[in-house]
Amino acid sequence: MSNSAIPLNVVAVQEPRLELNNERTWVVVKGGQQVTYYPFPSTSFSSNQFNFICNPPSAQTVLDRLVFIQVPYDITFTANPSHAGITENLLQPGRDAFRAFPISSITNTLNATINGFPVNIELAQIIHALSRYHTPLKVKNGWMSMQPSFEDNYQSYRDADGANNNPLGVFTSAAGLSELPRGSYTMNVVTNTTTTARITGVLYEQVFLPPFLWDGEQAGGLANLTSLTFNWVLNNNLARIWSHSDITNDVSGNSTIGSMNISFQQPSMYLGFVTPRLNIPIPPRITYPYFKLSRYTTQFQNTLAPNASSTFKSNVVQLDSIPRKLYLFVKQSDNVIYQNLNNQITTPDVFLQINNLNLTWNNQQGILSGASSQNLYDFSVQNGYNKTWSEFNGVTQQFNGVSGQPTKVIGLEGGIVCLELGKDVGLRDDEAEGVIGNFNLQVQMTVTNTNQYVTVTPDMYIVAVYDGTLVISNTSAMASIGVASKEEVLNARITHGVSYNELQRIYGGDFFSSFKNFLGKVGNVAGKVNNFLKDSKIASSVLGAIPHPYAQVPGQILKNVGYGESHVGGGKKKGGVLIGGRQLTKAELRKELKM
């Protein structure tokens, strides 16, 4: 008993150098008996779309969920006649490069069918907002370095000219351990003169589509596959694949690049298949994490001059389920970007500064109206945002060392707010992420145009992420979004045996393997969650007893991870950029095995 005013439990912890336990465990990693990677050339392709049939060699193989596309290209640039007489080559170092995620940037919709079930995502509309989340530098300089991925960080490329963090910079301009600029991406420069330029090469890019993965980590693969197809529907404005600094524009704003001709050769998709060992049976039905993204855009006629602020209100959005997350941002209208070639290649993928946010949720008004922009940044960082406060705030300055000259104001990339419902946005007693019903949402934002050169016509985006499950059986697949009822949420009891952070570490992946593998075998955290699941007999209801939306897991999923009628094993790590959550690292596993 402690001498505290409120008695405390006193425990002892061994100092690491005195952990002298001789008992050790040798870990054997059991992989497949055969691992094979196949290129699947497109069955048809054009400047409008790519089509693939990627049927697995056998339903008894497991598809690696890390999938990427390879696209050979040939691009010709022609100088703008208004720049006749220029003496510099058309493509300039630090002023020309591929856009971040170039294939996704020109993909209106990526469609896939899994055993006949359709899944899709509007890549071009959301990739540059969501890529600011759950993509730390380690990921960018690792797996994601196969594609240009350095996001635009200035409101105008002209402000990035000569900077170490210029997204269009070359390899030699990268400082220290920073992210490689997009100008370092390998290409073959066939010609580059004052009047014309031509580049050829190959672009690689991950498949950013649930239930596939794109963070470089492994997870439970897709099994029971009999058919798999992909359809990439491209934008009519293919020039959006390229970024060009407007610092070389003439006084009328005309770019040095007057035209671009973009052609693709036959693309391929690369998929890996693992044949399990004979003593590792594949269950007839497997449940995977799945999320659906819905985009709601409100366009405005008002314009914002440089440094001007205004308040904008979205249309009322009707939802039939409570989403897990909301991504909110305002950016230059696509109608403006696609007006001409100059706008397409010189407009960075950036956002307006968010000063204030006011939500109306299910007729409750004034939600988060008192939150400062610093609060909104904090919410976003907690939810996986990778950028600094200055970048989120969208503005910085540069002192002028010359007497009498003003300090230069520089516009930075601006903010994307991410809110988690149930944590950042309060919900009623009978509401939680995944609850089915009729809900209305309206967003009001006060924003500032921090671009020091360009007037902005704003579009407001609301991207809702709905969490659910994808069940794949021998011949079919089916997704479920909105899996909890109000009655289950009301009847769920609160437990103090599992903390929010503990649950976050294990949530967000392959349900059929993550809970079973992590919770059932190692660690005190695992034991607490494991015992709670058993003691509360929650396999037939929802994990709403844990005060966080991550805990709203349907009973059927729990049965698939070993609680209830079925019992399935496996191994898994992460669920992808939008989810987060992880299994034990190897270092943590070694530590736990020594305990």
Curated annotation (Swiss-Prot):
GO CC terms for this protein? viral capsid
The source's superkingdom equals Viruses
What is the name attached to this protein's record?
A: Putative capsid protein V20
Q: What does this protein do?
A: May self assemble to form an icosahedral capsid. Most abundant protein in the virion.
User: Per the record's keyword annotation, is Metal-binding included, yes or no?
Assistant: no
Question: Cytoplasm as a keyword?
Answer: no
Q: Assign the protein's first listed, main location to one coarse class.
A: virion
Location relative to the cell: Virion
Q: Which organism is it from?
A: Sputnik virophage
**Pfam families cross-referenced by the UniProt entry:** MCP_V20_C, Sputnik_MCP_1st
The UniProt keywords, alphabetically, are: Capsid protein, Virion
